[in-house]
């Protein structure tokens, strides 16, 4: 039987979001089966159009059965600095701390100081960063729609997903090659 269940919303990289009711069910499941729920909330702060991603830790009882991982990479333009934090179940955090203490030397102090400054300025920084991401999202989605390839505008994350055109269904590699050859655009098949 599993000892933990991972979950990701806003999903990296699918852009899917979940309502608080989803987390309520996850917490109830974790409590019923004595399973730790590990929620990857790396993109939870990158939201658009008034949407705010809920936290699993908003749910009553979540601190007993869940941990939530956060990253400053995209929300604060700190990609590559590998800085984040985790909150939730105290015994899980203690175990994670023990593992972390014995597997690496921690995060460079300068990066920790930059992260602290970013978090202190979150009310100013996050709207500015998200405005840039939203503008990029809108440019991509509008350009795709103008090309006859409409896509849904995601409420969260930095990704845009578009269906592979009908003539390339079943061969995303051929589509990626055609897009590179004909438009100079690189995508992952």
Please identify what each model-predicted range represents.
Residues 1-189:
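PLP-dependent class I/II
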């Amino acid at each position: 039987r599993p000892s933990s269940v991972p979950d990701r919303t806003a999903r990296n990289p699918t852009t899917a979001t979940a309502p608080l009711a989803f987390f309520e069910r996850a917490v109830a499941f974790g409590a019923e089966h004595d399973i730790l729920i590990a929620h990857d909330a790396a993109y939870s702060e990158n939201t658009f159009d008034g949407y705010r991603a809920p936290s699993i830790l908003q749910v009553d009882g979540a601190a007993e059965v869940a941990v939530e991982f956060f990253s400053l990479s995209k929300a604060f333009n700190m990609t590559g600095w590998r800085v984040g934090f985790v909150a939730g179940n105290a015994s899980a955090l203690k175990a994670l701390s023990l593992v972390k203490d014995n597997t690496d030397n921690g995060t460079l102090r300068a990066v920790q100081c930059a992260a602290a400054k970013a978090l202190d300025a979150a009310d100013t920084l996050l709207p500015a960063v998200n405005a840039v991401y939203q503008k990029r999202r809108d440019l991509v989605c509008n350009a795709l729609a103008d090309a006859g390839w409409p896509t849904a505008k995601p409420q969260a994350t930095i990704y845009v997903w578009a269906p592979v055109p009908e003539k390339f269904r079943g061969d995303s590699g051929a589509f990626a090659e055609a897009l590179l050859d004909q438009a100079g655009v690189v995508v992952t098949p």
